[in-house]
Each structure stands twice: as C-alpha cells, then as structure tokens.
A protein has these predicted regions:
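Fe-S-dependent hydro-lyases/dehydratases of central metabolism
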Residues: 4-233
Length: 233
C-alpha cells in the first residue's frame, strides 16, 4: 500500500505540491505504486490519511507480522502485537526487492508499568513519564516489550500512542502482547481474516507472548502512582 500523507499541500490539497522535491516524490510514489500493483491512496481518495492510522484502521497490521516502513514511528504497530520498525529509503528498496533486511540482532528490554492510574492521566502522559525515567537514549539498541497491569488496562488506541512514542527513548521497536482487546478491535475490519480463518488466527495469536521464564537483557519497572497530566515542548 502506498499512502500519501506528509506531502499533502494545504489548504487546497492540490494534486501535486508546489515544492519541487515534494512534487517529485509524490509523482514517483504514484507511478511506482501503480506500476508494481500497490494500492495507491492519493489526495481525494476517501481512504487516504496518515499512513499509520490507515494501516491500523484497515487491519493491514495483524499480530505476528514483521513490518518495516519509512518512518521511525512505525513502532506504533507493536500495540497490535506486530514487530515493526522504521527503515530508510535504501532499506525500503531492499525490502521490496528481497522481502529481507540485514540487521544486527536487537537486545530485549521489558518495561513493566504498575501503580494506580489517575482518572485524567492519558497514555501520552504515561509514555512521557516513561521517557523521562529512562532518558532519551534509555532504550538504544533494544526492542521494548511493555507489560504490567497498567498496560493491560489500556485501550488499543492508548496502546498505539504508547508504542508510537517508544522511539522517543530510542527504542528500535516496541511491542505489547496481543489480548482479547486487540482481537475485538481487529475482528470484522477490512483486511482481517474472516470465518474459520479468523478463529484459527486468534488461536495462533494467543501464543505470541513472552514465556513466564523469559529472560531479558534489561528490565525496568515503573510505578505511575501519583502521575499527573503533563505537557512537553
């Protein structure tokens, strides 16, 4: 799927941006996507939108998938149990040509979030607090698994926010084990499995979680009791 999002002219959203480089990029996106049989979502298409939102809402992201995309916040898909990470243009080219990428194995990090969540505390507040505790480089070289009672209580949309911003503490990727909330969110969506295939998929997805005795290279527990809404700039 090729989605035009960042290079969308405002306020009239004309077909091509006025800026030369942006215009060239959009034209190649449309041409290459069409030539190779991708669904191209250009301005004016009712399904066009911010790439990560479109992918999730249309269930192009499913538990157990491995996904690479040209944006660091691709890690957001970990909220649905996918292993996802941002990659550069050259890596996208290689990915499309070979379906593979050569990467150094990431270290594993578990962040367990506990405590009592205040009524006005959002997922954004929680991840900002985590970034504050771990530091801007606290997760460098790691894939982070979020878990704990606070995480389990989050809605799917809130988990998406959490995983989206894991890159702000330098996580290469982030993930939350899929549960019934995720299955309910995906069921019936456009590209989700249907019928008997759905039932089999859910049974498989339930196995995609860390074992109780799993070992991590780094483990952190963060208590959010007393956390209040915050702002960043």
């Amino acid at each position: 799927m090729c989605i035009r999002d960042s290079n969308s002219s405002a306020p009239d959203r004309t077909e091509f941006p006025a800026e030369e480089n942006a215009c060239t990029q959009v034209k190649y996106l449309i041409k290459n996507g069409s030539d190779f049989g991708f669904e191209v979502l250009n301005n004016g298409n009712p399904k066009q939108g911010i790439e990560h939102v479109v992918m999730v809402e249309r269930s192009k992201v499913l538990p157990g998938m491995q996904i690479g995309a040209g944006d660091s916040h691709t890690a957001m898909y970990g909220a649905l149990g996918a292993v996802a990470y941002g990659i550069g243009t050259s890596d996208i080219y290689h990915y499309l040509a070979t379906s593979t990428l050569r990467y150094k194995k990431l270290k594993n990090m578990r962040v367990r979030v506990t405590g009592a969540r205040g009524k006005t505390v959002t997922a954004k507040d929680i991840i900002l607090f985590i970034v504050k505790k771990l530091g801007a480089g606290g997760c460098t070289g790691h894939c982070v698994e979020f878990c704990g009672p606070v995480i389990s209580d989050l809605s799917v949309e809130e988990r998406l926010t959490l995983c989206n911003m894991a890159v702000e503490c330098a996580a290469r990727s982030s993930i939350i084990a899929s549960d019934q909330k995720v299955f309910d969110y995906l069921e019936g969506r456009e590209f989700a499995p249907k019928g008997e295939t759905w039932s089999k998929a859910v049974e498989f997805w339930k196995t995609l979680k860390s074992d109780e005795e799993a070992l991590f290279d780094k483990e952190v527990e963060i208590d959010i009791t007393g956390l209040e809404p915050s702002v960043t700039w």
